[in-house]
């Protein structure tokens, strides 16, 4: 978990420079998280604080009392618009939000351009709207009998499976809903497991920091309606953006920063979710879409 210094020529940078890598916590929680936690000021807070970096992997660090506990979960690429039928990364023409009002489906796109796909914020917004309008149930299944007459955007493929038709060439399927459900289950189960391991309750956490580029584009409404975050965190969320980059700047500008980051990484205890005896039950519970959050 210690920092290391290497010749910059090893990684294609100016040959007479030295490159310092920041310390990490484990093979699953790297130096980007150490830098991010340091930049957030989490360790200076006298209350219980949760730091979450959301990407293809979800890394979390919980500060409770004078202890630090970390874990990592496999979120998957769905929240970044990948592994989705018509998904794409955020860019011009990406659908970034949906609304269902009076049984009609509307959307907005990045740059107000013609829709060409759905990015991560749009993927979450779609599931949020489907839940709000009871089009999908707690298991993520589209309620065919109840909805097929009420919404003209519900269509059926050749095998009779329902899907959401946005445009002729842009759609959202049950498999896409499942990908979001798996991502939601991973993040929420990680949070629940951390809290359980720390022997505190969700309500005992006073601040939740969301880091990473993805987090700042997602509305609070989407986070809580879909259930990525428990309702106990409502009004406690703060978006920090790219904390890894901020931490790297701090390491360059403050001669004590790297030493402090090393202390932080050594102090943080990492545990694997799969090693928890009851993790299967925690994950199964976290998979379900909960109507209480809507």
Give the residues covered by each predicted segment.
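Active-site core segments that coordinate phosphate-bearing ligands/cofactors
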Residues: 41-52, 61-159
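Short beta-alpha connecting loops at secondary-structure transitions
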Residues: 20-24, 76-84, 107-114, 172-176, ...
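Short, small-residue-biased leader/transition segments that mark boundaries at the very start
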Residues: 2-5
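Flexible loop/turn segments at secondary-structure boundaries
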Residues: 36-37, 57-60, 69-70, 77-79, ...
């Amino acid at each position: 978990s210690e920092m290391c210094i290497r010749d910059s020529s090893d990684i294609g940078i100016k040959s007479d420079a030295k490159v310092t890598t920041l310390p990490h916590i484990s093979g699953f929680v790297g130096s980007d998280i150490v830098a991010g936690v340091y930049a957030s000021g989490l360790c200076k807070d006298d209350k219980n604080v949760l730091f979450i970096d959301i990407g293809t992997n979800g890394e979390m660090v919980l500060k409770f009392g004078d202890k630090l506990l970390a874990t990592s979960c496999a979120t998957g690429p769905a929240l970044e618009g990948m592994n989705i039928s018509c998904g794409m990364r955020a860019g011009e023409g990406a659908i970034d939000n949906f609304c269902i009002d009076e049984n009609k489906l509307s959307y907005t796109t990045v740059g107000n351009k013609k829709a060409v796909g759905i990015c991560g914020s749009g993927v979450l917004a779609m599931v949020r709207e489907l839940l709000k309008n009871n089009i999908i149930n707690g298991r993520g299944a589209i309620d065919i009998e109840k909805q097929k007459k009420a919404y003209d955007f519900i269509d059926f493929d050749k095998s009779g499976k329902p899907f959401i038709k946005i445009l002729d060439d842009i759609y959202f399927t049950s498999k896409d809903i499942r990908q979001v459900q798996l991502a939601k289950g991973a993040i929420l189960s990680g949070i629940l497991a951390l809290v359980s391991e720390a022997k505190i309750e969700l309500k005992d956490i006073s601040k939740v920091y969301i880091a990473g580029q993805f987090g700042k584009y997602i509305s609070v409404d989407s986070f809580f309606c879909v259930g990525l975050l428990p309702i106990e965190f409502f009004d406690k969320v703060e978006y920090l953006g790219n904390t890894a980059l901020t931490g790297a700047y701090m390491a360059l500008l403050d001669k004590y920063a790297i030493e402090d980051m090393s202390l932080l990484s050594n102090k943080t205890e990492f545990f694997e979710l799969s090693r928890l005896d009851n993790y299967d039950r925690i994950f199964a519970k976290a998979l379900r879409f909960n109507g209480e959050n809507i």
